[in-house]
């Protein structure tokens, strides 16, 4: 009997179009001999089609497992994961805690710092911060200004001076009340995919070669000019270090299922820094998460099979857990 897989995509987020593209790739990649797919589309106003998944156990007997493909807020941040927990439905990817912590760049950095993982020096501000320049005095230029809870480089700017810092702050606070300002790292941009629950494994890393000053939304999805190298041209020891740190970061934030961990390798110092972790990475034709696994020996269809099995396995583990006396 075929497994019935519900794919949720779209959403109220600046990454709506990326979600749609990722979902199309996943729907095309799921083996029709193994799976029957059900599409749940969420428009940019939050309306579900054909209708919302309701938070009542047993209300969705036609669904065996859910594959959320919602990038960014209202989907990658624990909100949909909480809904699926209430509905007692197995789902692909991190749980509520791992999703929420990973989505919030400040919380992710706090957890990594507690685990003594290498992170870039940063300052946290809010929309109400009276002077962004004063708040960031201890950081040298250039700086990166980022909404704390968005992905796909939406709302991110690189500031080289105080005037650009003010403009970057004005842009970022349109997307989030909390903003992260980081010391700019001049170096290589590297990524590593992680897969698994209790015993996660890391792929071979890749390198992003932006066509612009940094790998922003336009470079990722619109210009189609950025180049990638899979696997990255790195010494074996550095590759091993990236894979180890990717798994350590994954475990630190209590991730499950899948994630992509992004790194900077700084010129001059040759130091490696964890940039961020993405719990629902892109699955578009240009997305690096599946590409890294393909180069590590796991083809796209097999990757989807494994993600679904991890989701079902986690749900089976919960069925033997007592939640009441």
Swiss-Prot record:
Ligand binding (Mg(2+) 2): 276, 278
Enzyme class, first EC level, given as a word: ligase
Pathway: Cell wall biogenesis; peptidoglycan biosynthesis
Domain ATP-grasp: 109-309
An annotated GO cellular component: cytosol
Keywords on record: ATP-binding, Cell shape, Cell wall biogenesis/degradation, Cytoplasm, Ligase, Magnesium, Manganese, Metal-binding, Nucleotide-binding, Peptidoglycan synthesis
PROSITE patterns cross-referenced by the UniProt entry: ATP_GRASP, DALA_DALA_LIGASE_1, DALA_DALA_LIGASE_2
Catalyzed reaction equations: 2 D-alanine + ATP = D-alanyl-D-alanine + ADP + phosphate + H(+)
Stated role: Cell wall formation.
Protein's recorded name: D-alanine--D-alanine ligase
Organism: Solibacter usitatus (strain Ellin6076)
Gene: ddl
